[in-house]
Structure formats: structure tokens, C-alpha cells
């Protein structure tokens, strides 16, 4: 099983790490970190070589090399951006592996896709659950004058800096909240009631939607680079 990781591979070094397909088939596991992530960040960094095509040639090189040792069936698999990589790998090198199994792999139609917002607003979960999420977002906006100082202090304590005013970051974080909640599968019953105190609301808000995503210290510079320059074209 070849895992086409879309990000860093550090978590796969844990002794107890197991990937679903290798466990099901009792198969050998090869875990490939995406270039420019984790330990695969070059120094000095030249972003010109961070392309989808180059990442697929990385996988091709790994697979063709290891096939000299392992000549049985091969499965490529990945999750999210890694799932995208599984699909792209199959497209570029259709004969490298026998089976491709992408999980939750988005296929972007453009830089701004446009399908996410209607889905979150009208289709995900139940109308009652969607309303509870929306009510929380509205409450956090209504209390902005009281919660914004807490938000600003939190970001300052974390050392976050932004290229836009902190009040706008707050608003973006509120908008991001619904996507983050559904993405990570947070139970709706974990959302505080709208009459909860400021501290309770703020604690939940930050736990679900960490503002480092918008900061200049974003932990995903490589993701931002490849998403803007290459993934939008696929």
C-alpha cells in the first residue's frame, strides 16, 4: 500500500500508526511525504519546484524503485489532499499501481469553487443542526464588541500577526466556523447555548476554529503555495 500523503508524514512514524487498507490486507506500507512539507522542505527553498507534476514524479520514482523488491499488487491511497494526489497520480501514471483508493478527495473546479457554501447552508446534516450552527455564529457576531478583545489577546499571546485588521480576522473566523465544525465532525450538541456566558462561547469558538489559519505564521505555507498556483488548475 502506497500512501500518497498530501502533507507531512511525521505522524506515520508513530509505532502504533496503522493505515486502513494495509491493515485490512495485511500489506506492507510505504508512506510518502509530499514535497515541501515536513522533512521534505528544501533549504534554500525554491518554490518553482513545488508543482503537482513534480510530486507525482516523486511517487513514480518511489514506486518503480520499490517494485524491484516488491513485485506483488500495489494500492495507492490518500486522504483529502492526499486523496487528490492519489487521483492525479493515477492520471499521470495509470500503470504504476493496480488499485487507487482516494478518500474524501476534493476535485476543485476553480480557485473559488462555489459549491461549498450552498452545501453547508442547505444540505449538510439536518435543518435543525444547521440552524444551531448558524445561531452560534450570529451570537458570536452580536457579541463582537465583548469577544473581540478576548480574540485579540488570544492572538497576541500566540504571537499571531495578520495582514488585515484584527476585527476582519474575527469576522473571517466566524465564517470559517461552520466549515471547520462539519469538517472535523464536531457533534452539534457540543455547541454552547446562545445564552451561555462570554467565556464559554469564546472557548468553544477558538477550539473549533483556530485563527492561525489566517495568520502570517500559518503552519501551511506550502499548502497555500501549491493550492494557489497548481491545484486550482486541476
Annotate the PLM regions.
Residues 1-6:
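Short beta-strand element of the alpha/beta-hydrolase
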Residues 11-18:
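The serine-hydrolase catalytic nucleophile loop
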Residues 22-39:
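Conserved alpha/beta-hydrolase
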Residues 49-67:
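Alpha/beta-hydrolase active-site loop
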Residues 70-79:
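Alpha/beta-hydrolase fold nucleophile elbow
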Residues 83-94:
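Short glycine-enriched nucleophile-adjacent loop
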Residues 97-148:
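A catalytic-pocket lid/entrance helix-loop region that shapes and gates access to the active site
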Residues 229-234:
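Conserved small/polar residues in nucleotide/adenosyl-binding loops
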Amino acid at each position: 500500500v502506497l500512501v500518497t500523503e498530501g502533507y507531512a508524514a511525521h505522524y506515520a512514524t508513530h509505532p502504533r500508526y496503522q493505515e486502513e487498507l494495509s491493515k485490512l490486507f495485511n500489506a506492507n506500507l510505504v508512506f510518502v511525504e509530499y514535497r515541501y512539507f515536513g522533512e521534505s522542505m528544501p533549504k534554500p527553498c525554491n518554490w518553482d519546484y513545488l508543482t503537482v507534476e513534480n510530486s507525482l514524479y516523486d511517487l513514480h520514482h518511489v514506486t518503480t524503485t520499490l517494485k524491484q523488491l516488491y513485485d506483488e499488487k500495489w494500492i495507492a491511497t490518500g486522504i483529502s489532499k492526499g486523496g487528490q494526489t492519489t487521483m492525479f497520480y493515477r492520471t499521470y501514471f495509470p500503470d504504476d499501481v493496480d488499485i487507487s483508493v482516494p478518500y474524501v478527495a476534493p476535485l476543485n473546479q476553480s480557485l473559488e469553487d462555489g459549491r461549498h457554501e450552498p452545501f453547508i447552508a442547505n444540505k449538510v446534516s439536518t435543518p435543525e443542526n444547521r440552524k444551531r450552527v448558524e445561531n452560534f455564529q450570529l451570537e458570536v457576531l452580536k457579541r463582537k464588541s465583548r469577544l473581540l478583545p478576548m480574540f485579540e489577546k488570544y492572538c497576541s499571546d500566540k504571537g499571531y500577526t495578520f495582514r488585515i485588521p484584527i476585527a476582519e480576522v474575527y469576522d473571517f473566523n466566524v465564517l470559517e466556523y461552520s466549515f471547520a465544525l462539519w469538517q472535523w465532525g464536531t457533534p452539534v450538541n457540543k455547541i454552547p447555548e446562545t445564552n451561555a456566558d462570554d467565556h464559554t462561547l469564546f472557548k468553544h469558538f477558538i477550539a473549533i476554529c483556530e485563527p492561525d489559519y489566517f495568520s502570517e505564521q500559518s503552519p501551511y505555507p506550502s499548502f497555500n503555495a501549491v493550492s494557489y498556483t497548481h491545484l486550482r488548475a486541476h
